[in-house]
Structure formats: C-alpha cells, structure tokens
Amino acid sequence: MAGSFGFAGILWHNYLTFLLVNHENAFSTACEIVGPVKGSINDFARHDFSIFKELFDFDLTVLDNVLGTSCCSLICDYTNVDENSKLFNKRIRDRICTLSRRLGQADDVEEFMDDMVAFYKDFGVGKLGLHKAFRLEHLQTEGYVRIVPITKIAHVQLDDLVGYEIAKKKLID
C-alpha cells in the first residue's frame, strides 16, 4: 500500500489517515466545503475521533517487544523507494501525509477533530472529494458504468492556458 500510494514515515498513521479521508459518512460530508458544523453529530464524531486518537497514540514498539520482532519499528520510519503515487496525484498524497503527521502530533481529541474538519473543508472526502478529474469506465460484463479518478494530472493555472482569453476574463470577473 505504501508503494502504491507513495506514503512514507509512520505507515500506521498514513493508513489510519487514509481511512479517515476516504470514509464518506454523515460528519465528513457535512463538513466538506463548509467546515465546522453544529449539532449532535459533533458528539458522535468526537467519540469516533477519540478512538482514532488512541490508535494514533498506540506505541507499535510494544508489539515488537511482545512478539520479539522488529517489524513494527520498520513501518514507523518508512522511506519510500519512489515518491510518485500510482493511485493519488502528488498534491493529494502530500496533503494526506501532512495530515497524518498533524494527527500524530495532536495533543487532544479536539485538536485531532479540528485538523480533520479543516481537511474536509479544504479538500473534501472520498473519491469524488479528493480528486479533480474523472473518467467513466464501462464494464460490459457487469452492465454498469463506474466513475474512476484520474490520478496523473498536472496542476494547471489560468496563466498556463493559451488562448481562451475571453473565457478566462469571465472566470476572473
């Protein structure tokens, strides 16, 4: 998974963060784009984030000591062979890794929750929230169409576009 997604550092934290940023639920979708929301949903989310905070705080070296191995310590300081991600664009991968480090350093559940809400507001959640471009994949044998994110896209600014001056002006105005 680390190779496919381009993760590095504490892989346990990367994995937990990956779960959090991809799980579309009532709280994450409510916070998407708008940020903090009011209501009892925060109590449920705080409860769930307290469990995740405990998982982030768990010392994996305890497992190594109990099992007499060094496997867990290897995933606590992982260096990826290739920084490129096959499944995420670099911008998304970097944001997930940054969030992973922030969550690992969070002092309490409130800070943990604030970091997650900020991420949901800034980048969204799940496949449709995290990616910029998509393609339709027609599955003839199953008889349906699937939406698949395009992961290898360049970050383009308006200044990069040649022509389209009238359209660019309308966008800016």
Predicted region positions:
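Intrinsically disordered, low-complexity N-terminal extensions of AAA+/P-loop NTPases
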Residues: 1-100
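Alpha-helical interaction segments
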Residues: 2, 123-124, 161
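Interdomain "pre-motor" coupling segment immediately N-terminal to P-loop NTPase/helicase cores
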Residues: 81-147
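Dynamic helix-loop-helix/coil hinge segments at AAA+ ATPase domain boundaries and subdomain interfaces
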Residues: 103, 146-169
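Conserved helix-loop functional segments at active or binding sites
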Residues: 173
